[in-house]
Amino acid sequence: MIWHVQNDNFILNFTRIFMKAFHLPLFDGSFIFPECILIFGLILLLMIDSTSDQKDIPWLYFISSTSLVMSIMALLFRWREEPMISFSGNFQTNNFNEIFQVLILLCSTLCIPLSVEYIECTEMAITEFLLFVLTATLGGMFLCGANDLITIFVAPECFSFCSYLLSGYTKKDVRSNEATMKYLLMGGASSSILVHGFSWLYGLSGGEIELQEIVNGLINTQMYNSPGISIALIFITVGIGFKLSPAPSHQWTPDVYEGSPTPVVAFLSVTSKVAASALATRIFDIPFYLSSNEWHLLLEILALLSMILGNLIAITQTSMKRMLAYSSIGQIGYIIIGIIVGDSNDGYASMITYMLFYISMNLGTFACIILFGLRTGTDNIRDYAGLYTKDPFLALSLALCLLSLGGLPPLAGFFGKLYLFWCGWQAGLYFLVLIALVTSVLSIYYYLKIIKLLMNGRNQEITPHVGNYRRSSLRSKNSIEFSMIVCVIASTIPGISMNPIIAIAQDSLF
């Protein structure tokens, strides 16, 4: 009996040492517990789909949404915990990473209700759609906490593969297939460019893959001022540029937006930018800390091109989704200002604040587009003429979201841009902020042009699509309109709650 007790104690002590050595969640506070919730949700989806019939479809939506909400709650419960590095340095947990994870989870939580009625009307496979959304979300969450080059490469590939599959989900649609091919080819090329830049960092640092160790390695090898660092910086910037889709890396964006299912576009338009912004802040701020002047210059050029080209080309668009694609290119130019400012002068805090508002504004706009598309079957901007006469609630919701995207006071977009531009001005980015102000005013023009069409009540200018417009059933008000109402409220009245939002964003800085 004594031997058994000693043997049990030896096994227990050995297990504890083994777990502690590898920083497994059981003994270190469960760093990846939010990610494990999503993995458990994925397993449940597969089990239910393989063992049940069509009557359990609502359970699939319920499990997906519940797992996302529970992951958000898990992140909030461990807020302000000490930063931790786990899995032999591959994964880092801190408030700054977690706030990006919360934003990604929030995007996915709002996007699932947007897809319910759309999937039913188009007869798309439901389980696979939800699996791809949750897996892409999981990849984005791992990307936010990635602390070495291998994880930084694998995590966005997990997100990208699911994005490719989602963009081509309507296999019988020629435009969707074309968009998927362009997305896949350019995504593969950008991943190759990104990993080539990583190989330069790996070699110049003396074989290091952890971000902080790369900095130490560059100092030890005295390669931080070598031409190789500039080459690595250029390749990595181009690779990340595809994920952020600033000009001139934006060619895939309009085609993918136009050809993909609208709920997929809504999902990709926000989650990809949040995940890529998290990646950009870590890559540029840590390994390239000693080359800040060089990457500042590169990002300033990208921001200028994005703001100018995105807003100018958006004026000429006739498709609502293509217009939002070019609008998003301009919006990423504003977000890049926060990345350039960085930790000083509240640059990251202003970027996070504006990104939160951008999620609500953009998803609210897409919710309105999905509703209008399901009821009329069109995406043409001119076909929105006279919508206010048929559905005042939808027209007003779309108008508020568009005005908020344009940055008109007193809506959320105005306060977000004001804070972001002010931080850029304090950091000395005077020319960049002036261009941002001019292009913001320019964007108001094409937003107001759409709003003018919405409010047009003359019968001779109302299109047949609006003339035959039909209101949806009560069920849609529990799904698409639920997300729309939440996003519209978040896009219009957060001005009174700006201080708490900014305080949370500042508290997340590392």
Swiss-Prot record:
It is found in: Plastid, Chloroplast thylakoid membrane. It catalyses: a plastoquinone + NADH + (n+1) H(+)(in) = a plastoquinol + NAD(+) + n H(+)(out); a plastoquinone + NADPH + (n+1) H(+)(in) = a plastoquinol + NADP(+) + n H(+)(out). GO terms for biological process: ATP synthesis coupled electron transport; photosynthesis, light reaction. GO terms for molecular function: NADH dehydrogenase (ubiquinone) activity; quinone binding. Its EC number is 7.1.1.-. InterPro entries: NADH-Q_OxRdtase_suN/2, ND/Mrp_TM, Ndh2_N. The chain crosses the membrane at residues 26-46, 57-77, 99-119, 124-144, 149-169, 184-204, 227-247, 295-315, 323-343, 354-374, 395-415, 418-438, 484-504. It comes from the Eukaryota. Keywords: Chloroplast, Membrane, NAD, NADP, Plastid, Plastoquinone, Quinone, Thylakoid, Translocase, Transmembrane, Transmembrane helix, Transport. GO terms for cellular component: chloroplast thylakoid membrane. It is a multi-pass membrane protein. NDH is composed of at least 16 different subunits, 5 of which are encoded in the nucleus. NDH shuttles electrons from NAD(P)H:plastoquinone, via FMN and iron-sulfur (Fe-S) centers, to quinones in the photosynthetic chain and possibly in a chloroplast respiratory chain. The immediate electron acceptor for the enzyme in this species is believed to be plastoquinone. Couples the redox reaction to proton translocation, and thus conserves the redox energy in a proton gradient. Belongs to the complex I subunit 2 family. This is NAD(P)H-quinone oxidoreductase subunit 2, chloroplastic. The gene is ndhB.
